[in-house]
Amino acid sequence: IKNVARRVKSEVDAGNQVAVVVSAMSGKTNELVGWAQEVSPMYDAREYDVIVSSGEQVTVGLLAMALQSMDVPARSWLGWQIPIKTDGAHAKARIKEIDTTELDKRLNGGEVVCVAGFQGIAPDNRITTLGRGGSDTSAVALAAALDADRCDIYTDVDGVYTTDPRI
């Protein structure tokens, strides 16, 4: 988290407006999925989304706190707060619209907006998740909605593989 915060701070120090989309920490989503399956192998998809989206919520709060500790104005945002509007397909939702009104105000005011990736809000106001890789999808969609000059995606994996390295 502190490494990410330092990278974000360098962008801010260079005069850039920065929106950061985060994923859950490595292994956390799998842990949360395991908890859901342990409680109920036939779980409700809506409750599944509430559980697995919590990994991003922790990460985004920690990043905002790390930035604030470096004197970088920052605030965390969850998908429903923005809102990132999706269809109602829980665990595999698709982004329909992102209202950037409040984020634009914050960015123009010099604040770093830290967004929890992988999640949005369904038409019935329930949390949705976008499926695996959803944080990258969130980052690209948010960059497009904000008309960003660029979208940089960083990851904590060792490299790019053409096959599953665990085989």
Where are the model-predicted features located?
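Nucleotide/pyrophosphate-binding catalytic subdomain
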Residues: 1-167
